[in-house]
Regions:
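Short acidic-hydrophobic, aromatic-tinged amphipathic segments that line or gate anion-handling sites
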Residues: 109-117
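A short acidic, often aromatic-flanked loop/helix-cap motif at beta-alpha or helix-coil junctions
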Residues: 25, 58, 117
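STAS-typified acidic loop motif
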Residues: 3-43
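Amphipathic alpha-helical interaction surfaces in cytosolic regulatory modules
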Residues: 32-110
Length: 117
């Protein structure tokens, strides 16, 4: 499967869309994902990492409330990307429920976060 096909596969997952921003793939999350969708998404991300795409951004600016599955899968993605010396940046709005959750759980201290105002 080539990079364009994998990008279309990711876009077919409920609630997300992908963009190429500079040298990173940005995935915009709009709603929590069911576990089945996460399996499709993780497989696609893994394939793209194997193709050498190791810089990622997860845009959470439109996500109101992530579920526990989302949080666990985000941490899984971080570890997979770091294994290939890549980087995953989480983009969120200051004061949003996602930002507050990341502060409360202290994920903000261990993950790479970019805050939009």
């Amino acid at each position: 499967m080539d990079i364009q096909e994998l990008s279309h596969t990711i876009n077919d997952v409920y609630g997300v869309s992908t963009y190429l921003v500079n040298d990173a793939i940005r995935i915009k999350f709009r709603r929590p994902l069911p576990l089945e969708s996460w399996h499709v998404l993780l497989k696609s991300i893994h394939e793209l990492i194997k193709e050498g795409l190791i810089n990622w951004e997860f845009d959470l600016t439109e996500l109101e409330y992530p579920c526990s599955t989302d949080i666990g899968m985000w941490v899984t993605c971080v570890s997979r990307i770091k294994l290939k010396s890549g980087q995953l940046v989480f983009i969120m709005k200051k004061g949003s429920s996602v930002h507050i959750l990341f502060e409360f759980t202290r994920l903000i201290e261990i993950l790479n976060i970019s805050i939009e105002k």
